């Protein structure tokens, strides 16, 4: 008669797949993945609520906000130009140490 894997010479020679009950961390991994999913779900729900709130604005309110946003973007562009100019002046002054 053939012996099972565990009975041969007192040592297991063939590898049996471990069950989830034997992995103490398996349950933790499942909970962690579920927690991540739950966090992502809650975050997407909050973002959706914010999007819905913005859709209810009147056209006049959105126009005012668009103008303010455009003004802020223009200010950012001008500041970037200034920083580039300052940076290029600084690098040019390093090149010529007169």
Curated annotation (Swiss-Prot):
Compartment(s) where it occurs, according to its Swiss-Prot or TrEMBL record: Nucleus
Similarity-based family: Belongs to the TFS-II family. TFA subfamily.
Coiled coil: 59-89
Organism expressing this protein natively: Rattus norvegicus (Rat)
InterPro entries documented for this protein: TF_A-like/BEX
GO annotation, cellular component aspect: nucleus
Region (Disordered): 1-31
Chain's role: Plays a role in the negative regulation of NF-kappa-B signaling at the basal level by modulating transcriptional activity of NF-kappa-B on its target gene promoters. Associates with cyclin D1 promoter containing Myc E-box sequence and transcriptionally represses cyclin D1 expression. Regulates telomerase reverse transcriptase expression and telomerase activity in both ALT (alternative lengthening of telomeres)and telomerase-positive cell lines.
One GO-annotated biological process of the protein: negative regulation of NF-kappaB transcription factor activity
Biased composition (Basic and acidic residues): 1-24
Keywords: Coiled coil, Nucleus, Repressor, Transcription, Transcription regulation
The name this protein goes by in its record: Transcription elongation factor A protein-like 7
Pfam families referenced in this protein's UniProt entry, alphabetically: BEX (PF04538)
